[in-house]
């Protein structure tokens, strides 16, 4: 599996709107395994995880026009571009 762990820094007063944006219209694309967004107890930046079956599926998703459009809408709610940590998941266990 391949994917990204990323931080989202919402503009002041925009966290709830950002969460709503992320909830709506976010279908898992072909090759996607799942994705998650964490709202930390310390009220810091949101933390996201996107998981794909492999790097090829991850790259194909990033290149989709719909993904770019969604990213641009998300950027309107952020102070800065997300920080991305892309790589291969080496341990995964489900309960």
Task: Please tell me what each predicted stretch does.
Residues 12, 42, 91:
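Residue-level detector of flexible, active-site-proximal loop/helix-junction positions
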Residues 43, 86-87:
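Short, charged, surface-exposed hinge/linker loops at domain edges
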Residues 7-18:
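Short, surface-exposed ligand-recognition loops at beta-strand->loop->(often short) alpha-helix junctions
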Residues 2-8, 34-63:
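Short, well-ordered beta-strand segments in beta-rich or mixed alpha/beta enzyme
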Residues 24-34, 51-85:
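An amphipathic, aromatic/His-enriched active-site/gating alpha helix that lines ligand/cofactor pockets
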Residues 51, 87-95:
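Short, low-order "capping/linker" segments at domain edges
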Residues 19-23:
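Short amphipathic alpha-helical segment that frequently serves as the phosphate-/nucleotide-binding helix
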Residues 1-2, 94:
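N-terminal short leaders/motifs
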């Amino acid at each position: 599996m391949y994917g990204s762990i990323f931080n989202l820094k919402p503009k002041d007063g925009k966290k709830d709107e950002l969460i709503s944006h992320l909830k709506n219209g976010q279908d898992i694309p072909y090759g996607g395994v799942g994705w998650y967004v964490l709202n930390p107890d310390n009220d810091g930046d949101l933390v996201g995880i996107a998981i794909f079956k492999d790097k090829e599926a991850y790259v194909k998703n990033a290149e989709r026009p719909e993904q770019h459009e969604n990213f641009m809408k998300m950027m309107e709610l952020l102070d800065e571009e997300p920080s991305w940590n892309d790589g291969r998941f080496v341990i995964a266990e489900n309960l």
